[in-house]
Amino acid sequence: MIAKSNLVKVHDWLWEIPRSHRADMRVPARVYASDHMLDQITTDRSLEQLVNVATLPGIVGHALAMPDIHEGYGFPVGGVAAFDAADGVISPGGIGYDINCGVRLLCSDVPVSAIQPHLSELGAALYREVPSGVGQGGRLVMKGHDMDAVLEGGAPRLVEMGYGEAADLERTESRGKLEPAAAALVSSHAKDRGRDQLGTMGAGNHFVEVGSVEGIYDAEAAQHLGLFKDQVTVLIHTGSRGLGHQVATDFIRGMVRAMPRYGITLPDVELACTPFASNEGQEYFQAMSAGANFAWANRQLITWEVRQAWEQVLGDAGGPLRLLYDVAHNIAKIEEYRVGPVSKRLVIHRKGATRAFPGQPVLVPGSMGTRSFLLMGGEKAMAESFGSSCHGAGRRMSRTRAKKEIQGAELKQRLNAQGIVVNVGKLSALAEEAPEAYKDVNEVVDVIHQAGIARKIAHFRPVAVIKG
C-alpha cells in the first residue's frame, strides 16, 4: 500500500508520486485530492493501481486520478491515462467492464411544487416504464441486422426509430455515436446478452432520479443552460449492460494471450493491453466503440421511457423534458493534445472519469439521497488533466460491507423521512448504494472546482429514486 508520505504536494489540490518511487514507472502518477481526502484514499490499493498504470508502454504525461478514486479492475476507478496513438497501448481495464457507463440530465419547465402532489404516482410510473434489476429485459428485442444497426448507429439509430428527437443528439457527447464501431467484432455471445437489454437500467449503482435545482453557483451559465431554482430535473445513470461486459471479457482474454507476442510484461495481468496500432488493439477499439454506441442507445430509449411516464402522470401540465447533456465516464477516445513542443494524437482512457472540455457540461451524481452537481469544463483541464474531471462521489465501502452494516428497509425509511420517494426491486440492493458507502460528493466537487479543472454551476437534491 502507498502511504501519504510517498506523495509530494504539487499544490493544495494535487499530489504526485514521482517516477523515482518505483523503477518501472515511465511517468509520475498524480491524484487530485484534499489533504483530508488523501487520508481515506491511502486506505485501499487504488494508488498502487495508479502506479501500475504509470508503467504501461507509451503512456504520456502522468497517470492521473480524480478525487473520487477507488480500487477497480486493473486501473483504479477515477483513473485517466493518455497513450500515444502511434506507439502506445490500449487497455480494456482502463475503460472498464461497463463500457460507456454514463449520465444524462433531463430538465423540465416546471418547479418541483408542480409535481409534489404526484410524486408517488410518478415514481411508480417510472419504475413501471424503465425495466430495472439484474436480468430484466426491455421492450425491444434486437437481433441480426437490427442489433448491428444499433451497435454501429448508437443513439441516432434510436432517434430514427422514433425514440427521441434530433435535439437530443446535439446535447449528447459525440452525438451519441462513435464512428470506428464494428458490429462484426462484437461476439455473438455479447449480442445475445444485450438482445433484450436496450431501455433497461440494470442494478448496482444505476438509477433514474427525479430531483430539483437546489443551488445555483453561476447564474449566467445556469441561465444559458436553461436552469432555474427549484426546477424539476431527471438524472439517468446506466451503461452498456451485459453486452458491454461481454465485450470487455472477450478482449481481456484475447489480450492476455497476445501480450507475449509484443514483449509486454505487466505488474498486474488486469492491465492486459496490446499496442493501439496492432490488430488486437484496433479490433478492441472498434468493438468497444460498438459497446459505447449500445450504451448511448440504451440511455436514449430510457429517456423516451421517462418521457412516457412523465406524460402519463402529469399530462400537458408537466410540459416537455429536454435533454441538457449526456456524458460517458467509461470510455477510450482519440483526442489531440500538446505534448511538449508538438501536438499528438492520444488514446485517452477514462475510467470513472468524465470528459470536461471548456464550456461542456460535466455531470457528477452524488450518492443516493445526497445532492448531485452540474459543472462546466475549463481550459485548465485541457492543460492538466487531458480534458477530464471526476464522475461521482466514489465508493469508500465495498458492496459486501455495505450490505452487512446497513439495513435496506431502514435506509428506505430514512430516505422517505427526507421526502424522497423510493422505488426499488430489492432492499439489499438499496443498502449497497447507501450514502455512507460513498465519499462526500461535496468534497469531491470542491477539489475539482478549486483545482480549476471544472467549475460549479448548480446542484440538485433528489425527490424520487428508482433502482433495480
Task: Map each language-model feature to its residues.
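Domain-length cofactor-binding catalytic modules of enzymes
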Residues: 1-18, 22-49, 59-62, 73-75, ...
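A glycine-rich phosphate/pyrophosphate-binding beta-strand-loop-alpha-helix module
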Residues: 104-108, 112-124
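Short, conserved catalytic or adaptor-binding loops enriched in Gly and charged residues
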Residues: 55-56
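Redox-cofactor-proximal catalytic regions of oxidoreductases
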Residues: 80-106
